[in-house]
Design a protein with these regions (language model features):
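Metal-dependent nuclease catalytic cores that hydrolyze phosphodiester bonds in DNA/RNA
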Residues: 1-135, 247, 255
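Residue-level recognition of conserved beta-strand positions in structured domain cores
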Residues: 34, 146-149, 180
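A generic structural signal for short coil/turn motifs at secondary-structure boundaries
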Residues: 40-42, 152-156, 188
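Flexible, glycine- and charge-enriched loops at secondary-structure boundaries
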Residues: 45, 154-158, 193-196, 200
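Short active-site loop/helix that positions an aromatic residue
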Residues: 61, 170-171
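Glutamine-centric residue-chemistry signal
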Residues: 118, 164-166
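Non-catalytic protein-protein interaction segments used by genome-maintenance enzymes to assemble
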Residues: 123-164, 171
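Metal-dependent nuclease catalytic regions and adjoining charged, substrate-binding loops involved
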Residues: 172-257
Length: 257
């Protein structure tokens, strides 16, 4: 590739489940995020999840089950201020309540010895050019649990979530489960063998589709933009206003060439 042609991805690119999902749902949004580096700011849901998962980890590691919640509440408030989350103060109470549910779910299943928390793992996968990067929430001796904080509890696990944990189960060679919680309700689901096999194969196909797309563009950012319509409809992605404006300018500039 010529030195004056900006690549779509760098040589050290690594697959991730979120990257592939973004590409499948909206290739132009994927280009903005990974090719152009236009990243959306942290939102309220991300803040809630970060605080709830950290709170759960802390409570279990410190053996705080059933103890006075005042110290725990202060811990969450301190972390909120330390990380300088913006416009999400109301998520502090939600995160505290959700963490209590997460902790209860894990304790009821005798899951108390956390082997790792938010551990990064990078693995080569047969049939893929690029390795796969993974982050687990809670890893126990014989189970990986992915925590999902939400304000509306799903009646059944979301397909994307099952697909991701199917991928992780195969690559970690360990059973996986999904743990959902709102401030008032919770849901725990252990993946079946069929979930794992189907989820892994679907995720693998998404990775391969992305690699074929990169080949088709000759790893050229400009070529990728030329063959990919810019789709900024609120669904399936809520676009940040500044990113939307910047993306529109870039697409118009490339299309005029």
């Amino acid at each position: 590739m010529s030195a004056n042609i900006k690549p779509l991805i760098k040589e050290d690119f690594k697959h991730s489940f979120s990257s592939a999902s973004k590409f499948v749902k909206n290739p132009s949004e994927w280009i903005c995020h990974y090719g152009l580096g236009l990243r959306s700011p942290s939102n309220a849901a991300m803040t809630r999840g970060n605080l709830a998962e950290f709170g759960t980890y802390y409570k279990i590691k410190r053996g705080m089950n059933g103890k006075d919640g005042k110290a725990f509440s202060k811990l969450i408030e301190h972390r909120f201020k330390k990380l300088k989350f913006l416009n999400a103060d109301n998520e502090i109470k939600n995160a505290i309540d959700i963490a209590v549910h997460f902790e209860k779910i894990l304790y009821e299943r005798q899951l108390r010895d956390i082997k790792s928390y938010q551990r990064e793992e990078i693995k080569k996968v047969e049939g893929l050019k690029y390795p796969v990067r993974m982050f687990t929430d809670f890893e126990f001796e014989n189970l990986i649990v992915d925590a999902k904080s939400t304000l509306r509890l799903p009646s059944t696990p979301k397909i994307d979530h099952i697909r991701q944990q199917g991928l992780y189960s195969k690559l970690y060679e360990k059973p996986t489960a999904l743990m959902y919680a709102t401030p008032k309700k919770s849901l725990f689901y252990e993946l079946t063998d069929d979930d794992v096999n189907i989820g892994f194969n679907e995720a693998l196909n998404h990775f391969k589709s992305l690699e074929n797309y990169i080949i088709r563009c000759n790893n050229s950012l400009e070529e990728a933009i030329k063959i990919t319509p810019l789709y900024t409809d609120p669904n399936p992605f809520a676009w940040d206003h500044n990113i939307k404006q910047e993306a529109e300018k870039i697409w118009q500039k490339v299309m005029k060439k």
